[in-house]
Amino acid sequence: MIPLTLTDITEAVRASWAADTCSPDDLARGDWTSDNPSRGHCDITALVVHDFFGGELMVGEVHLGGEQHGHHWWNRFPSGIEVDLTLEQFRLGQVVTEGRAVQRPAGRPAPRWDEYELLRDRVRSRLGGYPGR
């Protein structure tokens, strides 16, 4: 078996983002475009990366003009390295606060299960499965 790298997973994730995996809220506001494909994908992308590497899920607040505009999710690996595959979605001067580690929700990540499952399956297909499985 050929080992997977973070670059392999990053490329597979980015190639798998689409309107049908975007957060419905971001999609309804017209925030998602093919020019900004990571928009509305931070939560489920962090879960998919966690599927491959484990570690911790990180969450921070998103602020613009001094007002909170939601939350942002990324990963911290067991080594302590933090990886954020969707940070580039913030193009309007948004600021993400320092994150805090949270436990992965048990079971289905409602209400985004369908989008998570679709993204996860696309990534897994592009990579030929999960390592060691």
Question: Where would I find each of the regions flagged by the language model?
Answer:
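A structural boundary/capping signal
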Residues: 1-133
